[in-house]
Amino acid sequence: VLIALGRWLQHSGYRVGVISRGYRSQALDEARQVAPNDDSASVGDEPLLIRRELEVPVVVGRDRLQALHTLIQDNAIDIVLSDDGLQHYQLPRDLEIVVLDGQRGLGNGRLLPAGPLREPRERLEEVDWVLERNSDDPHSGFEYHISGARHLASGRLVVWSDCLGQWGDQTLTAMTALGQPEQFFQMLTTQGLTVKTVSLPDHDVIMPQHLTGIVTETVLITEKDAIKLSGSIDSRLWVVEIEVQLPASLLTGLHDKLPTRVQT
């Protein structure tokens, strides 16, 4: 969602910057700007993916306020997007967007550790927008769409309709280290693909030993998995290109709330 929002802001003429904690990265104690050639162990997989996809300044660090100061001090920025920063109350903000899974909702509605919530559900009444994946609500619902697949070793990109024609009668392997892997697997099966699924712990790296014993000719992974790979690449790996279509009501609302960008 953040990448889709960042792209829309860029197309609207805004200079975008991003701050993030950089989960499981080595760059936590002091704010650090992410370089395109960094590795995920140093800065975190999600910040590195954001940096490469949007080609905008990204700063990681445990102290979000320090990360913000580093970002705006070193770069010309119109809008700062904070990745997963709702509870960082020292961080000033103009707009708040919460993203939920429409199927999971708020779980049992209880706060950690008894439930999944970081704050009471009433907090949602204070934010500017609540977006829900897998929701039929035209104002808040959004979906992920598969646009194609990229052969990781060669970089060859194939549109999704051609992928379905090529793989429709095959059994594939889908492997990922996402926190909610079932969403990725479901996206593939609803497209009519037959997949054997392999789930790794969230943020883990797909290693050669994970691929040992897999007999299928094609292994599908996500961009978040691919960003962590280096060295020799298994020729069976294909990266599924997934895009987010943001609800029109959000984009219209942002257009009305954001200041007009004056081109210089």
Language model: regions and residue ranges:
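Short, flexible loop segments at boundaries between secondary-structure elements
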Residues: 201-205, 236-263
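C-terminal accessory "lid"/substrate-recognition subdomains
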Residues: 105-218
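Conserved beta-strand elements of the Class I
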Residues: 17-19, 98, 172-175
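Walker A (P-loop) phosphate-binding motif
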Residues: 1-36
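Phosphate/Mg2+-binding loops and adjacent switch elements
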Residues: 22-138, 148
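Acidic beta-strand-to-loop metal/phosphate-binding motif
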Residues: 218-224
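Short, high-confidence coil segments that cap the C-terminus of an alpha-helix
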Residues: 14-15, 75-78, 169, 216-217
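Hydrophobic residues at beta-strand termini and immediately following loops
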Residues: 100, 142, 198, 240-241
